[in-house]
Amino acid sequence: MTSHPRSLALAAAAAFALAGCGQQAAKPAEAPAETPAAPAAAPAPVAVAPAVDQAALKGLLSPDETLEVLTLDATGAASASGEVKGYKTTVYAVPVAQGQTLSVAFEPSNTNLYMNVVDAADTSGAAAHRGEVDGPKASIAAAKAGVYLIKPFQPRATARRGESGTFKLAVAVK
């Protein structure tokens, strides 16, 4: 649409006259703007736990250790019970996604049983939780996705004598 020069001149003169007497020209009425619909909230990212490579994990175990992969229920919890007899024990594998926290409660039948929690990807052999020092409860925040091994054990002196004890584990990944 083109504007006629005379119409523009009249509009400018009217605005100038109103400005001179301290008034402003009325703005043309605008159609009420519709409020845009809020964008749908993005779904929270789902933490994806890594797959458990049992063959690779078995390579990290001693001949006296057997591997069991814990299956978490819908709430992210699992429990297990077992026995340590001498050096023989079951090692429990738990996959944990980046940003999740692995919580483990170890309940031994005697004071000579402990558990360590080890990041399977850590080749240094250092435990993320040392039961003898840190106690029977572990809480580990995963900086990256990985598999953690829960390793019940007894000290060498009692293991060499072939002593045994039972335990219960309560595991949660949140």
Model region roles, listed by residue range:
Residues A26-A56:
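Juxtamembrane proline-rich low-complexity "stalk" or linker regions positioned immediately after a signal peptide
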